[in-house]
Amino acid sequence: MNIFYVHKDPVVAAKMLIDKHVVKMIIESAQMLSTAHRLLDGEQYEDRTKAGRRIKRWRLKSKNEEAIIYKASHVKHPSTVWVMTSAYNYFWLYKHMIALNDEFMLRYNHTIPHMTIRKLKEILKYPPKNISLSTIQTDPTPAMPDECKIPGDVVGSYRKYYVMKKKEMASWKAPSQPPQWYTEGVENG
């Protein structure tokens, strides 16, 4: 679970992500947005996992939403907490998720959106009813090793994280290309 905040603009950030993250982060973004709905607007109850363990869950009042929105996941993860802090943060991630899908369709030559987008685009378009509208947008909390963090610079931290820790899996399918900051970071080692 993460938000690869490599640019403050959610669309530009999506274009800069490596191929693997373009696909994977559509699902993770939808999980965080869904979790925001469940925790902020849902009613908590106790359930059991398939293995019989007790687990906290949140039920939505709307049967339509309950049937469609993903289950709550990683409820204490810094990225999930960030999404739930304000409507502005929520909208940033929603726009990023849509841009990731556009990038997915472009890079992989798909004419049909990712399954997650087909299922959740409309229902996640609006933030939870109980999310703060008065809290301004903030940068996400960096979720990465300390050695990658640059104090006071979340974008720089995520870029450094990409250069230091994601090199082995870094690829950009044409027509996309690695961002300049990435190629310079790898060259300068």
Identify the function of each model-found stretch.
Residues M1-K76, T80-G189:
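Sequence termini and other peripheral, non-core segments
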